[in-house]
Design a protein with these regions (language model features):
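Hydrophobic helical h-region of N-terminal Sec-dependent signal peptides
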Residues: 11-12, 16
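Bacterial N-terminal signal peptides that target proteins for export
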Residues: 1-10
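N-terminal signal peptide c-region/cleavage motif recognized by signal peptidases
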Residues: 19-21
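Soluble non-transmembrane domains of integral membrane proteins
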Residues: 25-187
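Core alpha-helical transmembrane segments of integral membrane proteins
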Residues: 183-201
Length: 201
């Protein structure tokens, strides 16, 4: 009787420890508020280990929650050389009405970007960009890339994959249109100052 009781107690403790471990393994859910016009997403990003990447986006979307996602645990995405591709996701909770936001990926050294978001009809939309893409979406001015995303009411998830031929240190923001415009103007101003200093030298 005592052995059975101890067995049940140890089993209960193991289940509790496992649940704590699972919760600790993922990043917290981003609570989207209208007042937050520009958010650095790194603190809310989950990442797939390089040892278990899905073979395609179709495989990812088939069973997304069964994959071994873990918290990024970085203040900004800094992953070094990642030519094989890196899958990331933020989980977002929107308690208000539908919001339109801009997903910003800074830096010009992103060879391939794939952004996957859910449409209002339940299907998935996939968009690509990057310097390696045969399209006019290459980062001409070095200011990065931006994708409009619709954040529905309730819980939602954005998936994206990044590939880079250089060390991957890429700020990722979720912004309003006005915040994106201000950030672009600031970046362009800094770029212009750099060119001016170079010309003066």
């Amino acid at each position: 009787m005592i052995i059975l009781y101890l067995f049940r107690l140890s089993l209960l403790c193991a289940v509790a420890l496992l649940s704590v471990t699972v919760r600790a393994g993922s990043s917290p859910v981003l609570i989207l508020e209208h007042a937050a016009d520009r958010l650095e997403l790194a603190s809310w990003l989950d990442i797939l280990p390089a040892t278990t990447p899905p073979e395609s986006s179709e495989q990812l979307l088939a069973q997304p929650d069964t994959l071994p996602w873990r918290a990024l645990d970085q203040s900004v995405l800094a992953q070094g050389y990642r030519s094989e591709g890196l899958w990331l996701r933020p989980k977002i909770q929107n308690f208000g009405l539908v919001q339109r936001r801009i997903l910003e990926l800074n830096r010009s050294n992103l060879g391939h970007i794939e952004v996957i978001t859910r449409r209002s009809n339940g299907s998935w939309q996939t968009r690509t960009a990057g310097t390696a893409e045969l399209s006019p979406q290459g980062d001409i001015n070095g200011l990065g890339y931006s994708f409009e995303v619709v954040i529905p009411e309730g819980m939602s998830t954005i998936y994206f994959q990044l590939k880079s031929s250089y060390p991957l240190t890429t700020p990722i923001h979720l912004s309003t249109e006005n915040a994106l415009l201000r950030a672009s103007q600031n970046s362009a101003a800094v770029y212009g100052v750099g060119i001016g200093l170079l010309g003066g030298i």
